[in-house]
Regions:
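Cysteine-dependent hydrolase recognition
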Residues: 1-203
Length: 203
C-alpha cells in the first residue's frame, strides 16, 4: 500500500499526544492539509434559513476548512440514504470529511433523521468492521429559522467577537448524560475527559 500523499491536520494533535515518536514516523514528503467539513442541512426553502446556512459555511471556510455543503435533497431524506451519501464522500480521498455537521433537528422545518432512534454516531462508522467512528459528527439541532438565526448569533459572539479576558466560562465545562441506562462507558468517558482537562488546566 502506497503511503498517503497528504495528512489531514484535523487529528494531528490527537495523534501526536497518543503515538510514541509520532514526528519520526511521518512521511516527510507528505503534506498536511486543512480539515474537511461536510455540512448536510435540512431541505427548507426559507430565504433567511438558507442565508444563515451560507453564513455558517462561509465562516468555516474563513477559518480554513474545506467545506462541502448539501441539503437533504442531495444527501437523502432517510437515514440509509444519508449514510450512503456520507460513505461515498468518505470513500473518495479528495472529499473524505474529518467532520460532519448536520443542520436541523430530527423534527421541524429542516428535519434530518438520526441514524437510529437516539443518535447520529452510527453515521460515522465508515471504515472497517469495528464500532468506532472514523469522523467526528455534530448536529445543530434547530427546528425553525428563528432558532437558526439565534444559533448564528451565538457563533458570532463566541467565535468571532469573543473577549478572552472576560471569558472565564472557558475554564468550566458540563458533561451531559441521558435519562436511560447507558452502561459503564459513559462513566469511563466522563473520567477520561475529567483527567485530561485537569492535565491541561489544573486550576
Amino acid at each position: 500500500i502506497a503511503p498517503p500523499e497528504s495528512y489531514s491536520s484535523a487529528f494531528q494533535d490527537i495523534y501526536s499526544g497518543l503515538i510514541l515518536n509520532y514526528d519520526e514516523m511521518l512521511d516527510r514528503e507528505a503534506v498536511f492539509t486543512n480539515p474537511r467539513l461536510l455540512v448536510i442541512y435540512g431541505n427548507y426553502s426559507d430565504a433567511t434559513y438558507l442565508s444563515k446556512v451560507n453564513e455558517y459555511v462561509d465562516w468555516k471556510r474563513q477559518k480554513g476548512y474545506h467545506v462541502t455543503a448539501v441539503s437533504t435533497a442531495t444527501a437523502g431524506t432517510n437515514s440509509t440514504a444519508i449514510k450512503n451519501y456520507i460513505q461515498t464522500q468518505y470513500n473518495n480521498t479528495s472529499t473524505r470529511p474529518d467532520y460532519i455537521v448536520l443542520i436541523g433537528d430530527t423534527s421541524g422545518n429542516m428535519a434530518i433523521p438520526s441514524y437510529n432512534t437516539y443518535i447520529d454516531y452510527y453515521y460515522t462508522w465508515l471504515a472497517g468492521s469495528d464500532n468506532l467512528g472514523d469522523v467526528i459528527i455534530g448536529r445543530i439541532s434547530v427546528e425553525t429559522t428563528e432558532q437558526m438565526t439565534n444559533y448564528m448569533a451565538k457563533i458570532a459572539s463566541l467565535e468571532q467577537n469573543i473577549d478572552l479576558s472576560a471569558a472565564t466560562w472557558l475554564d468550566k465545562m458540563v458533561l451531559v448524560g441521558d435519562t436511560s441506562s447507558s452502561g459503564i462507558s459513559t462513566a469511563y468517558t466522563n473520567e477520561y475527559i475529567h483527567d485530561h482537562s485537569l492535565a491541561v488546566n489544573p486550576d
